[in-house]
């Protein structure tokens, strides 16, 4: 069971456009994630925030994907659908408290380190560029992250151990753009 915003850090292999991000709604994504965790009764389903990936490209209104697994096997489990539906409805029935949005950089597709760092904090993930896409992270894409969130992105949150060989280049890029960054291992 997962929540994420759509977008492509590189080539658009699953819809959308190359190197284009949809508009994120960090506080609502976090609220839905929390509701799914609270409502999840399925033993074989992990609840995760995923990195930004796939299309479509939506740039007029904030959007997100709330997903049940990645195959027909998971999609056909009625209880999973009920958990997702009730979680989304519960979240939408609340007054969403604006959080401080952050740009996640590095780590796995399912963002365990970044999610853990923000889950019980005042912060919420906007876009997340995972380790496998860091080579596509350039000045244009970083600027796009800060432009394509309906809430102000406060800083970049680095999955320090999940940045690999791109770490130095990305830090230099963030410093060049005067973007504050924090390390997950220091939070």
Describe every region a protein language model picked out.
Residues 73, 161-165:
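Short acidic, S/G/P-rich loop/turn micro-motifs used as interaction or catalytic elements
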Residues 97-161:
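Acidic, Ser/Thr-rich low-complexity intrinsically disordered segments
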Residues 48-95:
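Active-site-adjacent mobile loop/cap segments within catalytic or ligand-binding domains
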Residues 45-53, 99-106:
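A short glycine-rich, hydrophobically flanked beta-strand micro-motif that places a catalytic Asp/Glu
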Residues 118, 166-177:
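Short, aromatic/basic amphipathic alpha-helical patches
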Residues 1-45, 175:
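N-terminal catalytic cores of peptidoglycan-degrading enzymes
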Residues 39-41, 56-60, 95-97, 149-150:
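Solvent-exposed alpha-helices and their adjacent loops that cap or buttress functional pockets
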């Amino acid at each position: 069971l997962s929540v994420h915003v759509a977008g492509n850090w590189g080539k658009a292999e699953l819809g959308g456009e190359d190197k284009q991000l949809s508009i994120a709604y960090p506080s609502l994504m976090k609220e839905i994630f929390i509701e799914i965790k609270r409502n999840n009764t399925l033993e074989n389903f992990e609840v995760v925030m995923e990195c930004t990936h796939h299309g479509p490209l939506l740039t007029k209104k904030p959007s997100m994907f709330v997903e049940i697994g990645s195959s027909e096997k998971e999609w056909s489990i009625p209880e999973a659908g009920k958990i997702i539906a009730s979680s989304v409805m519960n979240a939408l029935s609340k007054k969403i408290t604006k959080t401080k949005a952050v740009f996640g950089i590095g780590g796995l597709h399912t963002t365990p380190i970044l999610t853990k760092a923000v889950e019980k904090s005042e912060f919420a993930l906007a876009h997340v560029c995972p380790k496998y896409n860091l080579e596509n992270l350039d000045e244009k894409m970083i600027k796009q992250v800060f432009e394509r969130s309906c809430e102000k992105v406060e800083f970049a949150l680095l999955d320090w151990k999940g940045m690999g060989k791109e770490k130095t280049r990305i830090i230099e890029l963030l410093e060049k753009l005067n973007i504050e960054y924090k390390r997950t291992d220091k939070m």
